[in-house]
Amino acid sequence: MNLWIKRALLALGALLLLAALAAMYFIATFDATHYKSVAIDWMKTERQRTLAIDGPVDLSVLPRLAVKVSKLRLSERGRADEFASIDEAALSLQWLPLLRNQLVVDSVSARGVRALITRDAQGQRNIDDLLGAKSDAAPGKTSGPAMRFEVGSVRIEDSSLALRDEQAQITGTVMMDSFTSGRLASGQETPLQFRTTVTLERPQVLRLTFDGKTALTFDAANGSATLRDATVKVGGDSEAVKSLHATLAGNLAWDGSTLTAGPIDVNLSDAKTAALTLGPSTLIAQRLVYSPS
């Protein structure tokens, strides 16, 4: 073997050994209480919010970076009212892809996530401070190539998002009973399954449940996405329609500016209005097109 190759391999081995030793030292000396305090102080100083971490923080760095937290609560800005809480969340990602400007997340899981999004009549939202200031950079210009990312799997259970929008006069809650996905990466098709409940108080009272599955493909570069072989069971009640039970099936595509659907099959099992009782029926739409612009 060439002498320089041997030296390069020895140097690489030494670097890997040093990295492993450094990781072992970091784990051995990791003080969760200290990092909790740092996060709590930063949130209080920079965002004027109170962060509470009542559960343990687990960390591992080899063979991948993995973090697990539980019992988190975050207050509204400048107030003690709860903005969000998490019963349990975990994330793990790979180290080496970061060197190639790639973010490869092995898995993301969360249970018991609760959040409240509000917007007042003037358009101010309670998340504006968390989103940060708008960039002054010219549109279309970036400091470098965008980081590529992929996620091996996502699992969310027993989570909800409450919405109070005074500007749009909407009050409601989206309850995510379960959501699972396969590998999420630009240009790759992945299966999705979900069970969710949407409840509205304004502009009208309704409660709808959705139980569905589909195959998602998205393109991060142009913002397009397709849903293939989507099947969604819908049930619920509203002020106008009671005892709704239906199944929707079909394909959807968004190219960044236009939504195209079709063919779409709507199979109604039953539904009731003030004047009618509807029995089993079917509606087929070969193609639907909607352009917001």
Regions found by a protein language model. Name each.
Residues 230-233, 264-266:
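Extracellular/lumenal glycan-associated surfaces
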Residues 191, 205-211, 243-249, 285:
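Transmembrane beta-barrel architecture of outer membranes
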Residues 49-50, 66, 70-187, 239-247, ...:
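Secondary-structure transition motifs
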Residues 54-65:
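Short edge beta-strands and adjacent turn/loop segments
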Residues 225-227, 261:
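Short, structured motif recognition centered on aromatic/hydrophobic residues
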Residues 1-48:
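N-terminal type II signal-anchor transmembrane helix
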